[in-house]
Amino acid sequence: MAATAQTHFQSDERHTSLLSATTLVGPATVFVAAGLLAPLAILFRYSFNRFEPRRMMVETFSLDNYVKFFADPYYTGVLWTTLRVAALCTVVCLAMGLPLAYVLARTQSRFKNVLIMLVVLPLFVGNAVRAAGWMTLFGSKGFLNVTLMQLGIITQPLQIMFTEGAVIAGIIAVNLPYMVLTLQSVIEGINRNVEEAAFSLGAGPATMFRRVLLPLSLPGILGGTILTFILGMNAYATPVLLGGPKFKMMGPLVYGQFQLNNWPFGASVAFILMTATLTLTATANILIQRRFRR
């Protein structure tokens, strides 16, 4: 009798817990569906329509926009440039962010919070403002060129602005805090005794990093690389301001098509960008996890 009553009580408790969870998750689910999935579905449908200057968009179902993109070397070149820049920025952010995150996670200094604030501080400034700051540094009369000329290192200003290098530097500056914060939170959760045990067994710093810290930091590495790669692939303000009109990435290309009222082609470019980003991040995730499971 008591067992039956306890079973009913546990069943009611689970039902109440499930109902509460549904109540909490429900509004967010509706918001995401209405604010993200529905517009994406509409945009996906637009990508199969046809563009006409006078009518803007003609309802049809054709793959012409996708064929146009992959048949034109210019557009495939823009996609390749975007992939290259995003991948390079992600690798540099990981190489710079991992040591910095390790120091922040392990330091006992009373200035730790100050150091974290210095990492977070750039996030309080918009991408356009940060890009404008880089323009004052990289310009022909910017701080870098003026300093080098005054020191006699160069006689003519270096052409840094409106180059791929300027865009890469700007995107790295934008994405680096995300990488550092993601890695720091994971490294702080790794027990220090694990590292000390590796050292006591004769492992050097390089071996400890490769055999102990790196595998345990894998969730943070995956999260940070995926986040920075997605941000790099979809960058807009930085390529526009630091790359100029001749340097094209997918984000500005999508926006440019919508400015020209070519919604069908703009929608197809947007979905090509999204598909490439999701495919590459998922593939990298699978390959990295398989590598560290061995």
Please name every model-derived segment.
Residues R55-E59, Y236-N261:
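Glycine-rich helix-loop "coupling/hinge" segments at transmembrane-helix boundaries
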Residues A198:
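The alpha-helix within a helix-turn-helix
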Residues L201-G202, P215:
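Glycine/proline-centered hinge or cleavage motifs at structural transition points of membrane proteins
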Residues V194, L287-R294:
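Short cytosolic juxtamembrane segments of multi-pass membrane proteins
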Residues D12-T16, M56-E59, L63, F69:
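Short, membrane-interfacial amphipathic segments enriched in basic
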Residues E59, G202-P205:
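Polytopic alpha-helical membrane proteins, predominantly small-molecule transporters/carriers
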Residues M1-L18:
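Short, Lys/Arg-rich, polar N-terminal cytosolic tail immediately upstream
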Residues S17-E52, V67-E188, V212-Y236, G243, ...:
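Membrane-water interface segments at the C-terminal ends of transmembrane alpha-helices
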